[in-house]
Design a protein with these regions (language model features):
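Short, acidic, metal-binding catalytic loop of nucleotide-sugar glycosyltransferases
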Residues: 23-31
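Glycine-rich, basic loop-to-helix element that forms the pyrophosphate-binding segment
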Residues: 63-79
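Conserved donor NDP-sugar-binding/catalytic core segment of glycosyltransferases
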Residues: 96-128
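Membrane-embedded multi-pass helical conduit in multi-pass membrane proteins
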Residues: 247-332
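Conserved small/polar residues in nucleotide/adenosyl-binding loops
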Residues: 334-341
């Protein structure tokens, strides 16, 4: 049987450790090597990690708070399996997760499968944040092809030898390390296969501040990705691009409304009719229709708490633009980025 190594990293996630580890030790595939990395936790996670160190299939690594990418690299260097799987501490893989990915790792003619990625299902709580996140992730999987360009961090498996050959996970990358290694593997001639029946369940993502901070990091990291891997057409895209344009569209619509009000107040009755005709042709169609489109989008795809949803989406759009600006600032200052070769 094929030995599979699974790496999971934790920093200050004491309440999530048992749930994740129990789902890993109960995997239907055997043999399995589970590598649990404590990334400088200060909330009691270190003690919980020590308890799991006694399990026969678990190896523990303790490191300073160096980040997820550094933790995964440490696990990769310690791994012995032919395949190296990764997941997150707030994820609960289904019992056949590893088995399903292994079944899809067999290369077809003229293919070299170097990674397999499964499907992450985000749970929903009663709050708006978790519902929006769940809907957004689900939308990304609706039309995902078999051969994909991203081995997602919560639910993927890599050929360990090929992953080491391309340098593994770069510890200097603060985010999107899964995307970086995916693109490197593809550039090296391999393919990544998506298998929808290899499922992991993500606990509901709640809390506006945490949600927005993650989306800002996403945007910041994507700038770096696009700078280093120019011309790549990503196939795992949800509603983020729609959300990105919410702030510009709202600004445009607000401009249309203010222009309308300003001109109406200045017009007399004689010129009012001609003004309305011009306004309909030039201002309403250009500036106000985006607001109707936005309203339709919210009614069709988002929870019933529309005002709260609009606030969350607008905040999301703002932090995406902030992340993009930070990403370009990184380009200028070479912050958190290895020097280009």
């Amino acid at each position: 049987m094929t030995l599979i190594s699974v790496a999971v990293c934790v920093r200050n996630g004491v309440d999530w450790i048992d749930g994740c580890m129990e789902s890993l030790v109960q995997q239907s595939h055997s043999p399995l090597e589970i590598i649990l990395v404590d990334d400088g936790s200060t909330d009691g996670s270190e003690e919980k990690v020590k308890q799991w160190d006694t399990h026969e299939n678990v190896t523990v690594i303790n490191q300073k708070p160096l980040g997820l990418s550094a933790g995964r690299m440490a696990a990769l260097q310690a791994a012995k399996g032919e395949w190296f799987a990764i997941t997150d501490i707030d994820v609960r893989p289904e019992a056949d997760w590893i088995q399903r990915m292994l079944e899809s790792s067999v290369s077809r003619e003229d293919e070299e499968v170097v990674a397999v990625t499964g499907r992450t299902v985000f749970g929903q709580a009663k709050d708006t944040i978790s519902k929006i996140r769940s809907i957004e992730i689900e939308s990304k999987y609706r039309s995902r092809p078999r051969i994909t360009k991203l081995a997602n961090g919560p639910c993927s498996m890599f050929n360990r030898k090929r992953l080491l050959e391309i340098g593994g996970f770069d510890p200097s990358w603060y985010h999107a390390e899964d995307m970086e290694v995916s693109l490197k593997l593809i550039q090296d001639g391999g393919i990544i296969v998506y298998t929808p029946n290899a499922v992991v369940n993500h606990i509901p993502e709640t809390g506006l501040k945490r949600f927005l901070n993650k989306r800002k990091r996403d945007a910041r990291a994507h700038v770096r990705i696009h700078r280093r891997y120019k011309g790549v057409k990503h196939d795992f895209i949800g509603s983020s691009w729609i959300v990105l344009w919410m702030v510009p569209l709202l600004a445009l619509g607000s401009f249309g409304v203010s222009l309308y009000v300003n001109n109406v107040l200045k017009l007399d009755e004689q010129n009012l009719e001609s003004f309305y005709l011009a306004l309909t042709r030039e201002v309403l169609l250009i500036c106000l229709l985006p607001l109707f489109w936005l309203s339709s989008y919210i009614r069709s795809d988002l929870p019933k708490k529309r005002l709260r949803a609009i606030f969350v989406l607008t905040s999301w759009s703002i932090v995406l633009w902030q992340g993009i600006l930070l990403g370009y600032l990184d380009c200028l200052l070479y912050t958190s980025d290895a020097a280009d070769d």
